[in-house]
Amino acid sequence: MLNIGQFSFHSRLLLGTGKFPDFDVQQKAIDVSEAEILTFAVRRMDIFDAKQPNLLEKLDVKKYTLLPNTAGAKNAEEAVRIAKLAKASGLCDMIKVEVIGDDRTLLPDPVETLKASEMLLEEGFIVLPYTSDDVVLARKLQELGVHAIMPGASPIGSGLGIVNPLNLSFIIEQATVPVIVDAGIGSPADAAFAMELGADGVLLNTAVSGANDPIKMAYAMKLGIEAGRLGFEAGRIARKRCATASSPLEGMSVVE
């Protein structure tokens, strides 16, 4: 089970809802992924205008936990305002903190992310900050009392996969809260690798919505995450420089 705050989930796949070709494809992809947590950008959805079509109208919201994010925020104050807007609309108190510090790389601003997380914790939110793979920053966020850490595998939407597995492994090893790898996942193999490293979950969007067949890719991601988790729990063999015979040599007869 994936435990975040007082919530528990069977699925370790968190799915973003942006950039799908249409609502029908989006819904089918969500269904086959079996994701229980769906994230969306509050600023890109007019949640107070009933005349505007949006994701919330199309979903059976009782089946999912909605994770609004603060995408578009440039500083902590903007992130807090967006989070409060989401809460006022009756959505879950869980919030993904996203404060971008660089428009080219879309990497998070570490100072403002820390500040926003602290402010939102004081407001009673369940806080999940999107961060880089900075090991020290992840620890400082954890010390604040956030409910999960969401380090990026690589820049948002890049599809580069996990470019720094060593740092991710350090973050996972020191974690006392769930670690959900977020951003940069491009394939089911990337998602499986994140889980093999010991991540508690994976959040992805573009890898599914931008695929040639988003529905098939959503299912593939589900399987990749499940396989990676099983592999982590099973425990891989140690890496060795030299070969080891897989068949026992004792008792074998020698042909003259």
UniProtKB/Swiss-Prot annotation:
Q: Which reaction does it catalyse?
A: [ThiS sulfur-carrier protein]-C-terminal-Gly-aminoethanethioate + 2-iminoacetate + 1-deoxy-D-xylulose 5-phosphate = [ThiS sulfur-carrier protein]-C-terminal Gly-Gly + 2-[(2R,5Z)-2-carboxy-4-methylthiazol-5(2H)-ylidene]ethyl phosphate + 2 H2O + H(+)
Per the record, its GO cellular-component terms are: cytoplasm
Q: Where in the cell is it found?
A: Cytoplasm
Please give the pathway this protein is involved in: Cofactor biosynthesis; thiamine diphosphate biosynthesis
Q: Which positions are catalytic residues?
A: K96
Listed SUPFAM superfamilies: ThiG-like
In terms of InterPro entries, this protein maps to: Aldolase_TIM, Thiazole_synthase_ThiG, ThiG
What family, per the record? Belongs to the ThiG family.
Q: Which HAMAP family match?
A: ThiG
Relate the assembly described in the record: Homotetramer. Forms heterodimers with either ThiH or ThiS.
Report the protein name in the record.
Thiazole synthase
Tell me which species this is from. Bacillus mycoides (strain KBAB4) (Bacillus weihenstephanensis)
Give the gene name: thiG
